[in-house]
């Protein structure tokens, strides 16, 4: 019976400790517009890549550091940024749970043709052309640039792990729409032969 009570107490201690990454119990601090890289965009313009970083300020981080979550916005590789839609919410929600979080911008844009896509919507009986077309290769290039920039953000954060108290062996990527594709490519595309 004594062994059973000890096992139950140990199990309860593990459950209580596991709540650290679940409950939104921490106060947070956020630093905006940190430059994590300088790049050339699709049109040859030089750009600075920015990120927002958020972390708990009243926690006791593990000796190895906090888990890191990188949030990547969507927008069809043409629009969006680190301050819109879901990434700001993910940034604060996960920091309140004990994570160090970052929301990143990545290079947007691609060359478009003059051809238009008919969206099967008619205005007063006339088909409406709602989008300009891009060559498929432009979508691949936009996707690849996004992945390169996300990997740059990841390198920046790992190189600053001590400063932001990050565990470089405990990293998560999350994205919406195009950001989801960028997150997947960042995690899994690691061989040059896999380049689209």
State each model region's role.
Residues 76, 108-110:
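Alpha/beta-hydrolase active-site loop signature
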Residues 1-22:
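Bacterial Sec-dependent N-terminal signal peptides
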Residues 63-76:
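Short beta-strand element of the alpha/beta-hydrolase
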Residues 119-162:
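Alpha/beta-hydrolase active-site loop
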Residues 19-64, 143:
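N-terminal cap/lid segment of alpha/beta-hydrolase-fold proteins
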Residues 76-79, 101, 156:
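Serine-hydrolase catalytic-loop signature spanning alpha/beta hydrolases and amidase-signature enzymes
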Residues 83-104, 111:
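Short amphipathic alpha-helix adjacent to the substrate-entry channel of hydrolases
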Residues 145-148, 152-196:
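Primarily recognizes the serine-hydrolase "nucleophile elbow" in alpha/beta-hydrolase
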């Amino acid at each position: 019976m004594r062994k059973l009570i000890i096992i139950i107490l140990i199990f309860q201690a593990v459950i209580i400790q596991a709540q650290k990454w679940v409950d939104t119990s921490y106060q947070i601090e956020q630093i905006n517009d940190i430059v994590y890289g300088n790049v050339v965009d699709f049109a040859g313009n030089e750009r600075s890549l920015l990120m927002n970083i958020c972390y708990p300020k009243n926690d006791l981080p593990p000796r190895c550091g906090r888990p890191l979550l990188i949030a990547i916005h969507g927008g069809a590789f043409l629009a969006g940024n680190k301050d819109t839609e879901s990434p700001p919410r993910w940034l604060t929600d996960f920091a309140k749970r004990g994570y160090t979080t970052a929301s990143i911008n990545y290079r947007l844009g691609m060359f478009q043709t003059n051809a238009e896509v008919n969206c099967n919507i008619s205005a007063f009986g006339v088909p409406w052309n709602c989008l300009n077309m891009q060559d498929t290769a432009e979508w691949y290039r936009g996707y690849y640039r996004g992945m390169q920039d996300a990997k740059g953000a990841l390198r920046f954060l790992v190189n600053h792990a001590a400063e932001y108290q990050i565990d470089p062996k405990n990293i998560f990527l999350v994205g919406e729409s195009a950001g989801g594709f960028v997150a997947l490519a960042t995690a899994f595309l690691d061989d040059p032969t896999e380049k689209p």
